[in-house]
Amino acid sequence: MSFKVNWNSLETDSLSTWTKEILTNALNSGKSPHILASNISIKDLNFGQSAPDFEILEIGELDRDRFRGIFKISYSGDFHLTLHTKVQANPLNIYYSNSLEKEVGIEDSEFITPQFGLSNEQFAIPLDLKLSDIKISGIGIIVFSKSKGLTLVFRNDPLDSIKVSSTFDTVQVLANFLQKQIESQIRDLFRETLPTLIHQLSLKYLSLDNNMNELRTKLAANASTSSSSTSSTSSSTTSSSSSSSPSSFTSSLDSANTTTSLKMLENEEEDFSLVYSAKNLQKNLKLFKSRETMSLHIPRFRNIVQRTHLDKFTKNYPNLINSLALSNNELQKFTHHPHSHNAVPIDIFKNESFEKTDGLLKDISNIQAGNYYKFATQKENTVKPKRRVIRLGKSKNKSKSKTETKTEHNDENSNNDNQIVPLSSTPASSSSSTLIEEMVEEPSTPIMKETSEFINPATKTTPQTQIHHPTPRKLELRVQADPELHSEVSTDLHSRSSAHHALYQEFIRSTQSPSLYDKVLTTCGGVGLGNTGYFSFVPQRALSASPIKALNEELNEKKSMNHMDFNRVSQRLEEKLKQNNGDMLRKNNSMNSNSNSVDAEDKPQLVHHDTLSATAAAYAGLFTAPPPPYYH
């Protein structure tokens, strides 16, 4: 039995990138030798145009879960592969690293070793290695078992010849060395590496059946924990309110899912084979291809509805309109129309009498209540769903009772308002009042009462429950009567405080004409801004806003306690400096006179005494000895 391989199907970008990734990971896995200065990368990969020949010589055993056969493979094509890396060209560095690894056994420099300057430096050279003209002819044995995987063994050495070319082909010694090394590595690949890789991959993809017991134990443990949690939640829901029912419902669903998964694992031949078997994968592949093409053959899956057959499935699906059509024959015409949601069309409630719509609403409420009771976890502890109830004919009684309570409340407030005592008696707003109303209680003296009545005879105080914001009023002259009475009242008022008395004394001193002060006292106008004269008589000079005005020179020149005169301070400083300078000169003169009297004979004579000034002659006694030399 022989086969033909479609070799052109391998010329795809996805396959080439996938093979490059696999080869790079395989070549760089493990410990790299010290002669390589970098990782190995694939520069070029081409499968060629000629395909290998594959022939089955013998089939020794063939069963549902096992296979054993002998095959022959031969290839002589134009496949080529180019690798790129960097090689270490410094032999001392290679020898140093190898000696550390072999003799010392430590890669790091923990052991005391000599450190050379340039001999241990790296010197990397790029290397391109091309493998081409591969010829393979070998006989192999394939053994497949569902429990042990796939095993491949070659009886002979399949590699006949291979051509190795690199950047070091000019050096014949290196070219021969590379040829021998690569041939030996490829022979080891066919002898040991390739069978082990194929066996490991087969175990990876066929280990589902071997791990069935582990899956069963894990799912059983999850089912036991979920069942215990559901039992605890069910016991808590019996004592708790209806708000905890959704959580118990979800936990019961989880436990149901775990139990169904356990049932699926128990039936290995039926359900579990559909999930993990190759037949299920083939069905999925057919389904995928049928959707890509216009194929009419669509495979069927258990408990799965195709999108193309969804209308047939939803036509008989139990929804609200279908359940209403069972009792009302008039609604059957609406059941044939597809609906994307579980709702009743609005056309049913249009152009219908009130009795029919009322009956439909009752049917809908009964269906919803029945579904609620049906899917509840425990029928004994179910709570009836709350419905909105509208009661007619009770709004009038409530409105009457509200109006009666409001009237009673207003009567009580009116009674309380009549019992309130006013805080103060404020006069009515008039143009002759002052600028700001005083809301404080006035002293209850007979004199103040008389004056207030005299000033505003026409106004009457009325009790007010609320304090209003004062309104500004214009300044006007007041018509005054009985000056004797007012003078007595004003003198009594101003004599109460000593501060006012001192204020008047300052006012008397500051005024230029005493007749004006007498006029103010006689008219009892007071010391205010509005009192300008005697019987609307305007004085010759206008009074200032402040009653105290400094007109004397002493008051103008008067300084504060914190005032500082800097001119006087500077004068005192100059006097002090002059005095200190005089004392210093006197001391120097006395010292010079004493030194002249004692050491007159030992004093050295100055050479240039005639060129010195008078001041230098005065200080000649100071230079008795030359100064010491200056050292840096």
Swiss-Prot record:
<keyword id="KW-1000">Mitochondrion outer membrane</keyword>
<keyword id="KW-0812">Transmembrane</keyword>
<feature type="region of interest" description="Disordered">
    <location>
        <begin position="384"/>
        <end position="435"/>
    </location>
</feature>
<feature type="domain" description="SMP-LTD">
    <location>
        <begin position="1"/>
        <end position="203"/>
    </location>
</feature>
<keyword id="KW-0496">Mitochondrion</keyword>
<dbReference type="GO" id="GO:0000002">
    <property type="term" value="P:mitochondrial genome maintenance"/>
</dbReference>
<keyword id="KW-0445">Lipid transport</keyword>
<dbReference type="InterPro" id="IPR031468">
    <property type="entry name" value="SMP_LBD"/>
</dbReference>
<dbReference type="GO" id="GO:0032865">
    <property type="term" value="C:ERMES complex"/>
</dbReference>
<comment type="function">
    <text>Component of the ERMES/MDM complex, which serves as a molecular tether to connect the endoplasmic reticulum (ER) and mitochondria. Components of this complex are involved in the control of mitochondrial shape and protein biogenesis, and function in nonvesicular lipid trafficking between the ER and mitochondria. MDM34 is required for the interaction of the ER-resident membrane protein MMM1 and the outer mitochondrial membrane-resident beta-barrel protein MDM10.</text>
</comment>
<comment type="subunit">
    <text>Component of the ER-mitochondria encounter structure (ERMES) or MDM complex, composed of MMM1, MDM10, MDM12 and MDM34.</text>
</comment>
<feature type="compositionally biased region" description="Low complexity">
    <location>
        <begin position="422"/>
        <end position="435"/>
    </location>
</feature>
<feature type="compositionally biased region" description="Basic residues">
    <location>
        <begin position="384"/>
        <end position="400"/>
    </location>
</feature>
<feature type="region of interest" description="Disordered">
    <location>
        <begin position="221"/>
        <end position="253"/>
    </location>
</feature>
<comment type="similarity">
    <text>Belongs to the MDM34 family.</text>
</comment>
<dbReference type="InterPro" id="IPR027536">
    <property type="entry name" value="Mdm34"/>
</dbReference>
<keyword id="KW-0446">Lipid-binding</keyword>
<dbReference type="GO" id="GO:0008289">
    <property type="term" value="F:lipid binding"/>
</dbReference>
<feature type="compositionally biased region" description="Basic and acidic residues">
    <location>
        <begin position="401"/>
        <end position="412"/>
    </location>
</feature>
<feature type="compositionally biased region" description="Low complexity">
    <location>
        <begin position="224"/>
        <end position="252"/>
    </location>
</feature>
<keyword id="KW-0813">Transport</keyword>
<dbReference type="GO" id="GO:1990456">
    <property type="term" value="P:mitochondrion-endoplasmic reticulum membrane tethering"/>
</dbReference>
<keyword id="KW-0472">Membrane</keyword>
<protein>
    <recommendedName>
        <fullName>Mitochondrial distribution and morphology protein 34</fullName>
    </recommendedName>
</protein>
<dbReference type="GO" id="GO:0015914">
    <property type="term" value="P:phospholipid transport"/>
</dbReference>
<keyword id="KW-1134">Transmembrane beta strand</keyword>
